[in-house]
Amino acid sequence: MTKVKVAGFGVSLDGFAAGTTQSLGHPLGLRGEEVFQWVFPTRTFRQMLGKEGGETGLDDRFARRAMEGFGAFILGRNMFGPVRGEWPDDQWKGWWGDNPPYHAPTFVLTHYPRPPIEMLGGTTFHFVSDGILHALQKAREAAGAKDVKIGGGVETVRQYVQAGCVDEIHLAFAPIALGQGESLLSGLDLRALGYRTVEHVPTDRATHIVLAK
C-alpha cells in the first residue's frame, strides 16, 4: 500500500528547518545549510551531484532511504525555485539543473499554472494550482505501488501533516540552533495527530527520529 512520507528533513535544535531570506544564493535561507551538514558528506548526496566517493555510515543509510522507493514527489514552490508571483518565462527549471535527483513525476504546488517540464533522468515537473489534496491525488496515481514523498519546503510539510496525510516523518535534528527561520514544529501537536517514535538513531552529525502513525 502506498504511504506518504517526509524523509531526510533537517531540523535545528530550536525547530527551524530553513533559514530566513531564501534566495538564489541561499536556497535554504541564511544558515539553512547548517541543518543538512549530516547529508552533504554522504555517498548518496555526492551521487546526486554526479560525484564519486562519500561516507557510507548511518547518515548515508538515512540519506538513501530518503530518496529510494518513491514513485512520486510533491514540492512547494520554494523547493522548485526562488521565483515569486507569475512565471516570467520558462527559463527556470529547478535548483538541480537538467537532471534533478527525483527521477519520477514531481508535483510542484503553485498558485500560477505552468505547462509540465520534462527533465533528464525521468523527472517531470507538474505544476498543480488547485490545492494540496489534488496534488496528493495526482502523486498517488503516478506513484503506483511505490510511496509518495513530501519533499518540502517547511510550509508544505506542515500543511500535509496538519491535514493528516503523512504516514511517516523522518527528521534529522542537527546539533545547532538557528535562532530564527522557518519553524517546522511550532503549533504542531504530533501526539494528537497520532504519531509515535518508531526509530531513534544518533550519529556524529545528527539525531535521526522517525515518527509513524
Can you describe what each PLM-predicted range is?
Residues 1-213:
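Enzymes that bind and transform nitrogen-containing heteroaromatic metabolites
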